[in-house]
Design a protein with these regions (language model features):
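Soluble or luminal CAZymes and related metallo-dependent hydrolases
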Residues: 48-55, 99, 158, 162, ...
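Conserved catalytic-core segment of nucleotide-activated headgroup transferases in glycan assembly
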Residues: 1-84, 160
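Donor nucleotide-activated moiety binding/catalytic core segment of transferases
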Residues: 71-119, 124
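Short, solvent-exposed loop/turn segments at secondary-structure junctions
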Residues: 20-24, 75-79, 116-118, 134-137, ...
Length: 214
Protein backbone atom coordinates (compact mmCIF):
# COMPACT_ATOMS: atom_id res chain seq x y z
CA UNK A 1 0.00 0.00 0.00
CA UNK A 2 1.30 3.51 -0.82
CA UNK A 3 0.93 4.65 2.79
CA UNK A 4 3.59 2.16 3.85
CA UNK A 5 6.16 4.40 2.14
CA UNK A 6 5.64 6.97 4.91
CA UNK A 7 6.59 4.53 7.66
CA UNK A 8 9.96 5.02 9.28
CA UNK A 9 11.92 3.73 12.28
CA UNK A 10 13.02 5.51 15.42
CA UNK A 11 12.70 2.55 17.76
CA UNK A 12 12.82 3.12 21.49
CA UNK A 13 12.02 0.98 24.52
CA UNK A 14 8.32 1.63 24.20
CA UNK A 15 5.38 -0.79 24.27
CA UNK A 16 2.40 0.49 22.29
CA UNK A 17 -1.14 -0.65 23.13
CA UNK A 18 -3.58 0.37 20.44
CA UNK A 19 -6.88 -1.55 20.39
CA UNK A 20 -9.91 -1.00 18.19
CA UNK A 21 -13.34 0.19 19.32
CA UNK A 22 -16.53 -1.71 20.16
CA UNK A 23 -19.86 -0.76 18.64
CA UNK A 24 -21.86 -2.13 21.56
CA UNK A 25 -20.19 0.07 24.18
CA UNK A 26 -19.60 3.34 22.35
CA UNK A 27 -21.49 6.50 23.21
CA UNK A 28 -23.52 8.57 20.78
CA UNK A 29 -21.73 10.05 17.79
CA UNK A 30 -20.71 13.70 17.97
CA UNK A 31 -19.98 15.48 14.65
CA UNK A 32 -17.22 17.64 16.15
CA UNK A 33 -15.29 15.10 18.23
CA UNK A 34 -16.59 11.77 16.83
CA UNK A 35 -17.38 10.62 20.37
CA UNK A 36 -19.11 11.42 23.64
CA UNK A 37 -18.38 10.09 27.11
CA UNK A 38 -20.08 6.75 27.86
CA UNK A 39 -21.10 6.45 31.53
CA UNK A 40 -21.18 2.67 31.63
CA UNK A 41 -17.71 2.22 30.13
CA UNK A 42 -15.93 1.20 33.35
CA UNK A 43 -18.32 -1.74 33.77
CA UNK A 44 -17.40 -3.29 30.42
CA UNK A 45 -15.06 -6.21 29.84
CA UNK A 46 -13.14 -3.98 27.43
CA UNK A 47 -12.25 -1.48 30.14
CA UNK A 48 -11.52 -4.16 32.72
CA UNK A 49 -9.18 -5.99 30.34
CA UNK A 50 -7.11 -3.02 29.18
CA UNK A 51 -7.05 -1.22 32.52
CA UNK A 52 -5.97 -4.52 34.05
CA UNK A 53 -3.28 -4.96 31.40
CA UNK A 54 -1.66 -1.54 31.83
CA UNK A 55 -1.72 -1.95 35.61
CA UNK A 56 -0.62 -5.58 35.84
CA UNK A 57 2.25 -5.69 38.31
CA UNK A 58 4.06 -8.54 36.56
CA UNK A 59 4.14 -6.58 33.32
CA UNK A 60 5.04 -3.30 35.02
CA UNK A 61 7.84 -4.95 36.98
CA UNK A 62 9.39 -6.44 33.84
CA UNK A 63 9.10 -3.14 31.96
CA UNK A 64 10.79 -1.28 34.81
CA UNK A 65 13.53 -3.90 34.95
CA UNK A 66 14.22 -3.59 31.21
CA UNK A 67 13.79 0.18 31.03
CA UNK A 68 10.58 0.17 28.96
CA UNK A 69 7.78 2.71 28.91
CA UNK A 70 4.25 2.10 27.70
CA UNK A 71 1.82 4.15 25.62
CA UNK A 72 -1.89 3.29 25.63
CA UNK A 73 -3.84 4.91 22.79
CA UNK A 74 -7.60 4.62 22.61
CA UNK A 75 -9.52 4.55 19.34
CA UNK A 76 -10.87 8.05 18.47
CA UNK A 77 -14.42 6.85 19.17
CA UNK A 78 -13.35 6.03 22.75
CA UNK A 79 -11.08 9.05 23.13
CA UNK A 80 -13.09 10.70 25.91
CA UNK A 81 -12.84 7.56 28.05
CA UNK A 82 -9.14 8.17 28.73
CA UNK A 83 -10.10 9.66 32.12
CA UNK A 84 -11.32 6.23 33.26
CA UNK A 85 -7.93 4.54 32.94
CA UNK A 86 -5.39 4.55 35.74
CA UNK A 87 -2.03 6.03 34.84
CA UNK A 88 1.13 4.79 36.52
CA UNK A 89 4.88 5.37 36.35
CA UNK A 90 5.24 3.07 33.31
CA UNK A 91 2.18 3.66 31.11
CA UNK A 92 0.88 6.94 29.73
CA UNK A 93 -2.73 7.03 28.56
CA UNK A 94 -2.90 9.19 25.44
CA UNK A 95 -5.44 12.01 25.72
CA UNK A 96 -5.81 13.12 22.10
CA UNK A 97 -5.41 12.15 18.49
CA UNK A 98 -2.46 9.97 17.57
CA UNK A 99 0.30 10.49 15.03
CA UNK A 100 0.31 6.84 13.99
CA UNK A 101 3.51 6.92 11.96
CA UNK A 102 5.32 8.50 14.91
CA UNK A 103 4.14 5.99 17.52
CA UNK A 104 4.79 3.11 15.12
CA UNK A 105 8.32 4.39 14.55
CA UNK A 106 9.09 4.82 18.24
CA UNK A 107 7.55 1.59 19.57
CA UNK A 108 9.47 -1.67 19.88
CA UNK A 109 6.32 -3.81 20.06
CA UNK A 110 2.57 -3.39 19.79
CA UNK A 111 -0.53 -4.85 21.39
CA UNK A 112 -3.73 -4.67 19.37
CA UNK A 113 -6.84 -6.75 18.84
CA UNK A 114 -8.57 -6.71 15.45
CA UNK A 115 -7.31 -3.40 14.08
CA UNK A 116 -5.90 -3.26 10.57
CA UNK A 117 -3.14 -0.96 11.81
CA UNK A 118 -1.35 -4.19 12.69
CA UNK A 119 -0.42 -4.46 9.01
CA UNK A 120 1.42 -1.12 9.15
CA UNK A 121 3.29 -2.13 12.28
CA UNK A 122 4.13 -5.57 10.89
CA UNK A 123 5.53 -3.90 7.76
CA UNK A 124 8.23 -2.48 10.04
CA UNK A 125 9.03 -6.07 11.06
CA UNK A 126 8.22 -5.31 14.69
CA UNK A 127 6.46 -7.82 16.98
CA UNK A 128 2.73 -7.78 17.66
CA UNK A 129 0.62 -9.42 20.37
CA UNK A 130 -3.11 -9.78 19.62
CA UNK A 131 -5.58 -9.51 22.51
CA UNK A 132 -8.90 -11.08 21.53
CA UNK A 133 -10.60 -11.78 24.85
CA UNK A 134 -14.01 -11.00 23.30
CA UNK A 135 -13.63 -12.55 19.85
CA UNK A 136 -17.10 -14.12 19.55
CA UNK A 137 -18.93 -11.03 20.78
CA UNK A 138 -16.78 -8.71 18.68
CA UNK A 139 -17.83 -10.29 15.39
CA UNK A 140 -21.45 -10.48 16.49
CA UNK A 141 -21.62 -6.79 17.39
CA UNK A 142 -19.44 -5.03 14.81
CA UNK A 143 -20.64 -3.80 11.43
CA UNK A 144 -18.38 -6.10 9.43
CA UNK A 145 -17.84 -9.83 9.17
CA UNK A 146 -14.78 -11.89 9.92
CA UNK A 147 -12.71 -11.98 6.74
CA UNK A 148 -10.33 -14.50 5.21
CA UNK A 149 -7.47 -13.45 7.51
CA UNK A 150 -7.10 -15.99 10.32
CA UNK A 151 -5.17 -14.47 13.20
CA UNK A 152 -4.07 -17.81 14.59
CA UNK A 153 -2.49 -18.97 11.34
CA UNK A 154 -1.93 -15.75 9.37
CA UNK A 155 -1.35 -13.20 12.13
CA UNK A 156 1.96 -11.53 12.89
CA UNK A 157 2.09 -12.60 16.52
CA UNK A 158 0.46 -14.73 19.22
CA UNK A 159 -3.28 -14.44 19.88
CA UNK A 160 -4.24 -14.11 23.55
CA UNK A 161 -7.75 -14.77 24.82
CA UNK A 162 -7.36 -13.66 28.43
CA UNK A 163 -5.34 -11.27 30.56
CA UNK A 164 -2.94 -13.84 32.00
CA UNK A 165 -1.85 -15.16 28.60
CA UNK A 166 -1.40 -11.60 27.29
CA UNK A 167 0.79 -10.68 30.25
CA UNK A 168 2.80 -13.89 29.85
CA UNK A 169 3.48 -13.15 26.18
CA UNK A 170 4.45 -9.55 26.85
CA UNK A 171 6.74 -10.38 29.76
CA UNK A 172 8.54 -12.95 27.60
CA UNK A 173 8.71 -10.54 24.66
CA UNK A 174 10.20 -7.72 26.71
CA UNK A 175 12.56 -10.10 28.48
CA UNK A 176 13.92 -11.00 25.03
CA UNK A 177 14.28 -7.36 23.94
CA UNK A 178 11.24 -7.59 21.65
CA UNK A 179 12.74 -10.11 19.26
CA UNK A 180 10.19 -10.90 16.57
CA UNK A 181 9.51 -14.66 16.47
CA UNK A 182 6.99 -14.21 13.65
CA UNK A 183 9.30 -12.55 11.15
CA UNK A 184 8.84 -15.40 8.64
CA UNK A 185 5.09 -14.75 8.50
CA UNK A 186 5.73 -11.07 7.89
CA UNK A 187 8.17 -11.69 5.06
CA UNK A 188 5.92 -14.32 3.47
CA UNK A 189 2.86 -12.06 3.65
CA UNK A 190 4.33 -8.90 2.12
CA UNK A 191 5.64 -9.33 -1.42
CA UNK A 192 7.83 -6.23 -1.08
CA UNK A 193 9.08 -4.44 2.02
CA UNK A 194 10.63 -1.22 0.77
CA UNK A 195 9.83 2.42 -0.03
CA UNK A 196 8.57 1.85 -3.59
CA UNK A 197 4.89 1.08 -3.00
CA UNK A 198 3.66 4.40 -4.38
CA UNK A 199 5.80 3.97 -7.49
CA UNK A 200 4.45 0.47 -8.12
CA UNK A 201 0.86 1.68 -7.81
CA UNK A 202 1.51 4.63 -10.12
CA UNK A 203 3.26 2.41 -12.66
CA UNK A 204 0.32 -0.01 -12.58
CA UNK A 205 -2.16 2.83 -13.14
CA UNK A 206 -0.15 4.18 -16.08
CA UNK A 207 0.15 0.71 -17.60
CA UNK A 208 -3.57 0.06 -17.18
CA UNK A 209 -4.35 3.43 -18.76
CA UNK A 210 -2.18 2.56 -21.78
CA UNK A 211 -4.04 -0.73 -22.27
CA UNK A 212 -7.42 0.99 -22.05
CA UNK A 213 -6.44 3.58 -24.67
CA UNK A 214 -5.03 1.21 -27.28
Amino acid sequence: MPRFDALYEDTRKQLLILPSWRRSISGAYDEKTSSVYFDGFVETDYFKFYNGLINDERLLSKMREKGYKGLFCLHPIFMKQYVDFQNNDVFDVNEGFVDYNKVFAESAAMVTDYSTIAFDFAYLKKPIVYTQFDQKQFYEDQVYDKGFFEYETDGFGPVCYDLDSAVNELVELIDNDCKNKYIDRVENFFVNIDKNNSKRVLDAIIEDDKKRNK
